[in-house]
């Protein structure tokens, strides 16, 4: 089992540790609800060092990545990050990822932990077609910490006073020095709140983690586990690989049309996307249940005539709304907000309603 550089801290703090994609990761510390609410009201600190990260370098690096992904990377300037998707030729999703453009010949990529090896192999298989393109896997040498919440910038200013975080635009990043090491600070996140994600060499993870927690103590900062990370992203309707998106899902049927630029030229999976665009049959939608039963992945959705119309992608009890909420892959004709649906949970039909995503308003909305 793999461990992040912060694993000893998590263990000492009494975190509940689980196996997540081959990594021993904290799922909770004080409790999922308390941690969730801390991020929504104050700030939370996440160890997300299990995420994979690669460099793509060379004079044809941008051309290569344009071929491999759906978004238009030429629109990103140096110092900007871009949410993106890689597809198989049939339009199924290899992974969703963030690409950071350092300069015209240097790109940094963060991918999902469970897809790290698969993604790297997929990129390697196609890089041979582009002379001079070099791939470097830095996943084992780098740590990634996320600071998220409405008070995140107040805390960050105490630890990194040279960073003018509020002036750092959404999906922009910069590099700066901290205790003699270089940090990459990006205004990105997975919670819907103001915040940053910070990439650094492994040896700097613990000092920075402890400095941020100490600086944030007066503001109510908490360390946050994967459990609250999931409830936070689900309240926003953000995709999680293996749930809303996977190898059998086309991005045009998963609320990701905005990152598929069919007019940019050829990319892997473009032809499949063109076919789906002509007649998309389903998409991902949000729903809320009336009772207390929790929807789980794979539960079936039905209309009032008892016809199956979709399946649950993710579900939880929203700590903000105090209602069972979920996302589902749903036939398009049932996606109008207010539409009545029924979710089969343990053999009983639970009534619910389609609701727009995101479910909640945040410091970014």
Curated annotation (Swiss-Prot):
GO terms for molecular function: aminomethyltransferase activity; transaminase activity. Its EC number is 2.1.2.10. It comes from the Bacteria. One of its GO terms (biological process) is glycine decarboxylation via glycine cleavage system. Keywords: Aminotransferase, Transferase. One of its GO terms (cellular component) is glycine cleavage complex. Pfam families: GCV_T (PF01571), GCV_T_C (PF08669). It catalyses: N(6)-[(R)-S(8)-aminomethyldihydrolipoyl]-L-lysyl-[protein] + (6S)-5,6,7,8-tetrahydrofolate = N(6)-[(R)-dihydrolipoyl]-L-lysyl-[protein] + (6R)-5,10-methylene-5,6,7,8-tetrahydrofolate + NH4(+). It is an enzyme of class 2 (transferase). Gene3D superfamilies: Aminomethyltransferase beta-barrel domains, Aminomethyltransferase fragment, Probable tRNA modification gtpase trme, domain 1. The glycine cleavage system is composed of four proteins: P, T, L and H. The glycine cleavage system catalyzes the degradation of glycine. Belongs to the GcvT family. NCBIfam families: gcvT, PRK00389.1. PANTHER family: AMINOMETHYLTRANSFERASE, AMINOMETHYLTRANSFERASE, MITOCHONDRIAL. HAMAP family: GcvT. This is Aminomethyltransferase. It comes from Chlorobium luteolum (strain DSM 273 / BCRC 81028 / 2530).
């Amino acid at each position: 089992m793999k461990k992040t550089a912060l694993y000893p801290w998590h263990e000492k703090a009494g975190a509940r540790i689980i196996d997540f994609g081959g990594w021993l990761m904290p799922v909770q510390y004080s409790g999922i609800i308390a941690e969730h609410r801390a991020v929504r009201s104050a700030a939370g600190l996440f160890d997300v060092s299990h995420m994979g990260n690669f460099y793509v370098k060379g004079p044809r690096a941008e051309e290569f990545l344009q071929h491999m992904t759906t978004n238009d990377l030429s629109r990103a300037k140096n110092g900007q990050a871009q949410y993106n998707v890689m597809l198989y030729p049939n339009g199924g999703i290899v992974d969703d990822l963030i690409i950071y453009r350092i300069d015209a010949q240097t790109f940094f990529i963060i991918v999902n932990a469970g897809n790290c090896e698969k993604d790297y192999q997929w990129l390697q298989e196609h890089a041979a077609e582009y002379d001079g393109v070099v791939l470097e896997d830095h996943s084992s040498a780098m740590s990634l910490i996320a600071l998220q919440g409405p008070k995140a910038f107040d805390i960050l200013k105490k630890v990194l006073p040279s960073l003018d975080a509020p002036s750092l635009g959404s999906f922009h990043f910069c590099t700066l020095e901290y205790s003699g090491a270089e940090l990459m600070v990006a205004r990105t996140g997975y919670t819907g709140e103001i915040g940053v994600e910070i990439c650094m060499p492994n040896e700097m993870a613990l000092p920075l983690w402890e400095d941020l927690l100490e600086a944030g103590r007066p503001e109510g900062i908490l360390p946050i586990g994967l459990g609250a990370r999931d409830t936070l992203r689900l309240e926003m309707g953000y995709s999680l690989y293996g749930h809303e998106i996977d190898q059998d899902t086309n991005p045009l049927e998963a609320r990701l049309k905005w990152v598929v630029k069919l007019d940019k030229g050829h990319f892997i999976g473009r032809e499949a996307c063109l076919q789906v665009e002509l007649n998309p049959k389903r998409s991902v939608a949000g729903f809320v249940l009336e009772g207390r039963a929790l929807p789980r992945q794979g539960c079936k959705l039905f209309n009032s005539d008892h016809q199956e119309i979709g399946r649950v992608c993710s579900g939880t009890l929203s700590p903000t709304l105090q209602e069972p909420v979920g996302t589902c892959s749903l036939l398009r004709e049932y996606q109008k907000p207010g539409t009545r649906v029924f979710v089969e949970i343990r053999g009983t039909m639970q009534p619910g309603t389609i609701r727009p995503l995101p479910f909640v308003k945040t410091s970014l909305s």
